[in-house]
Amino acid sequence: MSATLVIMAAGLASRYGGAKQIEKVGPGGEILMEYTIHDAQRAGFDRFVIILQPQMLEDFRAVCGERLEGKAHVDYAFQSFDALPDWFTVPEGRTKPYGTVPAVLSGKDVITGKFAVVNADDYYGPGAFTLMYEALEKLPETGRGCMVAYNCLLYTSPSPRDTERS
């Protein structure tokens, strides 16, 4: 089965203070997205669509584009207000991109077949991509979706108030 991983990387990262999508985190200057693509390929994903803002492409390619493009089938799509449905009105003065659905809509011309969506600045680990791929394999060709979620209640830690009482 062919499966595409859509990687949303068009966020402004304004709280972070820079383009965290291309922040080097690995010993060889790898960015988090390279680990995502590696893990996803091992699970069976064979195509990657990276959603960026147009002005991000040059910096992205300078940091890791050649490495990624040499290891995987990579297409780029650009998140812009132009990809939004005609009936949607963007408030005057808004420059910040909208979230998940508008990002995926930006890639509608290059996303084909079964696909999964992830954030560029999160680490999912190999197991998540195996679950995603296996779930996609079980779906009919059209009309159905799935989601990989985690039970966060399994990973609770004491709150600051609990430690103050100790």
Language-model region placement:
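Conserved N-terminal catalytic core of the sugar/cofactor nucleotidyltransferase
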Residues: 3-4, 27-117, 124-131, 138
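N-terminal nucleotide-binding beta1-loop-alpha1 segment
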Residues: 1-19, 23, 30
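Feature marks short, surface-exposed loop/turn motifs that line or immediately flank catalytic pockets
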Residues: 12-13, 83-84, 154
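Conserved beta-strand scaffold positions in the cores of enzyme catalytic domains, especially
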Residues: 22, 76, 145-147
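Residue-level signal for beta-strand positions within conserved beta-sheet cores that form or flank
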Residues: 1, 18, 70-72, 143
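Conserved donor-nucleotide/metal-binding helix-loop-beta segment in metal-dependent transferases, i.e.
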Residues: 128-154
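Single conserved hydrophobic/aromatic residue that forms the stacking wall/gate
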Residues: 155-166
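Short beta-strand segments
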Residues: 8-9, 117-119, 147-151
